[in-house]
Amino acid sequence: MKIGIIGAMAQEVEILLGYMAEPKLTEIAGCKIYEGKINNTDIALLQSGIGKTAAAMGTALLLQLTKPEMVINTGSAGGLDANLNVGDIVISTEVRHHDIDVTAFGYEKGQLPANPAAFMANEQLAQIAIKETEKAGFNAVSGLICSGDLFVNGNDMIARIRNDFPSVKAVEMEAASIAQVCHAFQVPFVVVRAISDVADKESHLSFDEFLPLAAEKSSEIVLAMLNNFA
C-alpha cells in the first residue's frame, strides 16, 4: 500500500520528511515529491506550494506519477468553530470551495459545474484520524473545511463565509482543490490540519507565530495514522 501525503509549505512537510528513510526527490513544475518509507509504509510526500492552483497541479502529478491508494492532506488552518483554539485539530467530513459562485446558473455556493457541491472525505480515514487525535489527547473538531485563494483575515470576510457555509469549522487555501482532484481520480482522501490561527483581524500575526506548532501537531497525527496501515 502506498499513501500520498500533501502539505503546501516546507514547514508543513519537513517533520514527516525527517521520518522518511532514503527519500527520493522528484521536482516538477514547482512541486516536490518525496518517495520513501515511513514506519514501513510506502509514502509519496508532496510539497505542493500555496493556493488552490498549486495544490490541484501537485495533486494531479502525485496521483499520476506515484499512484497512491489514499491521500492525507496535512498542515495548518484557520479556525472558524467556537470550539477550536490554536493547536487544536480539525478533521474533514467534507470540503468545499468558499470563493466560487456560479449560483446564477442554479448551482450551490462553492459548486463548480460537473462537480458535487461538497467533496466527501473517506469515512474510514476520518475515523482513524479522530481515533488517533483522541489517543494523543488533542482537542479536535470534525466537519466542513472550506478553501479559497485568500487568507481569511477580517470580520467582513469571516461573516461572508459563515453566512454562505453555516457549518464551516475551518478555512485554508488548498484542501478543496486536493479533494476535487482526488474525486476525479477516485482516490479516497481526508484532511487533517492543526489550527494556526483563529480567523479574526489579528489572524495574520497568529499564523506567523503558531505555524510551527500547527505543523508539529498535524504531523504527529498523520504519523500516528500511518501505524494503522503498516
UniProtKB/Swiss-Prot annotation:
Example GO BP: L-methionine salvage from S-adenosylmethionine
GO CC annotation: cytosol
Keyword field: Amino-acid biosynthesis, Hydrolase, Methionine biosynthesis
Gene Ontology MF term list: adenosylhomocysteine nucleosidase activity; methylthioadenosine nucleosidase activity
Substrates-to-products reaction catalysed: S-adenosyl-L-homocysteine + H2O = S-(5-deoxy-D-ribos-5-yl)-L-homocysteine + adenine; S-methyl-5'-thioadenosine + H2O = 5-(methylsulfanyl)-D-ribose + adenine; 5'-deoxyadenosine + H2O = 5-deoxy-D-ribose + adenine
One family name in Pfam for this protein: PNP_UDP_1
Similarity-based family: Belongs to the PNP/UDP phosphorylase family. MtnN subfamily.
NCBIfam families: MTA_SAH-Nsdase, PRK05584.1
Protein name: 5'-methylthioadenosine/S-adenosylhomocysteine nucleosidase
Gene label: mtnN
